[in-house]
Swiss-Prot record:
The gene is atpB. One of its GO terms (cellular component) is chloroplast thylakoid membrane. Gene3D superfamilies: 2.40.10.170, Bovine Mitochondrial F1-atpase, Atp Synthase Beta Chain, Chain D, domain 3 (1.10.1140.10), P-loop containing nucleotide triphosphate hydrolases (3.40.50.300). It comes from the Eukaryota. It comes from Populus alba. This is ATP synthase subunit beta, chloroplastic. Belongs to the ATPase alpha/beta chains family.
Length: 498
């Protein structure tokens, strides 16, 4: 699908053709604006309020038209704080939706929802902008090739492999490691695949956004000396922003990614942290606009809003967008409408478990709950499929036996079940892995494990060749050779203690 980029500045289109209205009502981030008869702006048009407040501070607020109320009134949602706005202030209809800068000049820079740089590195050197509201690519333009996207993370590559050009969801409650996993994926993909990434920070912590930026500079993903050599563009609309900005920042990031796909014909990675906050912002805006709430207080348009965003994240014959989205699960309830609606759009789901995080097994990916449409023998091959199924069977049997172990103890199990439990505990620990982005916390260097190495390691555990090794030897290591070396070191340490 080709974009027709314009060549005006970012944020708002040229303001020459002035269609002027004035503010009639302000309720928090929502403005009612009156326009002259016959000059009503279209839905999604950007409106700009410029002027000075009561203490002569400059005001420049951009809003987006959401409703036409009748009587020449429109209702718009502000993209920044509405402090200092007053009734009667002049409002300019720009005659077009919000437009943001696109292209190579966006790499290495941080933007807000309007496409304005917020990193104090001066203006963006691009004349090309693109509107954030566009239709999804036509069905005939979509690409249908199936191939695996290797991440270097054992548990993901083996049990819930990602599809190149697919959509992946990271599900988890608060504090189980979604953001760390996303940061590791950005790091691994930038190093191993050398692709261009766009990161959309939607309604998450500003501190984490800052940490991510600093880490990217340290690791070279963002090149400070030569900013054009950078591999990622960052778009932030964090927790402190009004709901309008949080609702639209995902579209800003997606618009930048679409340009790399359609015009530059590149394979792009789009990270969204957190897609739940996109839904949450939509819910806030929906309530402010006076719509009747739906199930659990969510907006009645939940499925439509999610579909509009997700249908644009796709692969065409020009290039691909592989999207990795963190999904916060409220109160760890996967049946909540927000995560449940997201599930429908995904090719793979990586579910993070509080139980595993409590055991200290990181990444805390639940091997039985995580799924992928790619885990089929005709796609991944017989060896990979068989190994993954046997790993899942072993872990499932261990899960079934846990109640018996808790009540009666290990000694009451049959010989076969005891062996299954021992291997399952080794597998559980071998699914952990030291991360590059967590080196500061763990003290151990990060590891990238190729898919072939991962399969070899799990086949060895399942075959029983490593039954004699202690289970702690498999904890936080890379490939299986490191586990055997760690077992030898542990044995030597024990002998020295004796």
């Amino acid at each position: 699908m080709r974009i027709n980029p314009t060549t005006s500045g970012p944020g708002v289109s040229a303001l020459e053709k002035k269609n002027l209205g004035h503010i009639a009502q302000i309720i928090g981030p929502v403005l009612d604006v009156v326009f002259p008869p016959g000059k009503m702006p279209n839905i999604y048009n950007a409106l700009v309020v410029k002027g000075r407040d009561t203490v002569s501070q400059q005001i420049n607020v951009t809003c987006e038209v959401q409703q036409l109320l009748g009587n020449n009134r429109v209702r718009a949602v502000a993209m920044s704080a509405t402090d200092g706005l007053m009734r009667g202030m002049e409002v300019i209809d720009t005659g077009a939706p919000l437009s943001v800068p696109v292209g190579g000049a966006t790499l290495g820079r941080i933007f807000n929802v309007l496409g304005e740089p917020v990193d104090d590195l001066g203006p963006v050197d691009t004349g090309t902008t693109s509107p954030i509201h566009r239709s999804a690519p036509a069905f005939i333009q979509l690409d249908t090739k199936l191939s695996i996207f290797e991440t270097g993370i054992k548990v993901v590559d083996l049990l819930a492999p990602y599809r190149r050009g697919g959509k992946i969801g990271l599900f988890g409650g608060a504090g189980v490691g979604k953001t760390v996993l996303i940061m590791e994926l950005i790091n691994n993909i930038a190093k191993a695949h050398g692709g261009v990434s766009v990161f959309g920070g939607v309604g998450e912590r500003t501190r984490e956004g800052n940490d991510l930026y600093m880490e990217m500079k340290e690791s070279g993903v963002i090149n400070e000396e030569n900013i054009a050599e950078s591999k990622v563009a960052l778009v932030y609309g964090q927790m402190n922003e009004p709901p309008g900005a949080r609702m639209r920042v995902g579209l800003t990031a997606l618009t930048m990614a679409e340009y790399f796909r359609d015009v530059n014909e590149q394979d792009v990675l789009l990270f969204i942290d957190n897609i739940f906050r996109f839904v949450q912002a939509g819910s806030e805006v929906s309530a402010l606009l006076g719509r009747m709430p739906s199930a659990v207080g969510y907006q009645p348009t939940l499925s439509t809003e999610m579909g509009t965003l997700q249908e644009r994240i796709t692969s065409t014959k020009e290039g691909s967008i592989t999207s990795i989205q963190a999904v916060y699960v409220p109160a760890d309830d996967l049946t909540d409408p927000a995560p449940a609606t997201t599930f429908a759009h995904l090719d793979a789901t990586t579910v993070l478990s509080r139980g595993l995080a409590a055991k200290g097994i990181y990444p805390a990916v639940d091997p039985l709950d995580s799924t992928s449409t790619m885990l089929q023998p005709q796609i991944v091959g017989e060896e990979h499929y068989e190994t993954a199924q046997r790993v899942k069977q072993t872990l499932q049997r261990y899960k079934e036996l846990q109640d018996i172990i808790a009540i009666l103890g290990l000694d009451e199990l049959s010989e076969e079940d005891r062996l299954t439990v021992a291997r399952a505990r080794k597998i559980e620990r071998f699914l952990s892995q030291p991360f590059f982005v967590a080196e500061v916390f763990t003290g151990s260097p990060g590891k990238y494990v190729g898919l072939a190495e991962t399969i070899r390691g799990f086949k060895l555990i399942l075959s029983g060749e490593l039954d004699s090794l202690p289970e702690q030897a498999f904890y936080l290591v890379g490939n299986i050779d490191e586990a055997t070396a760690k077992a030898t070191n542990l044995e030597m340490e024990n002998n020295l203690k004796k």
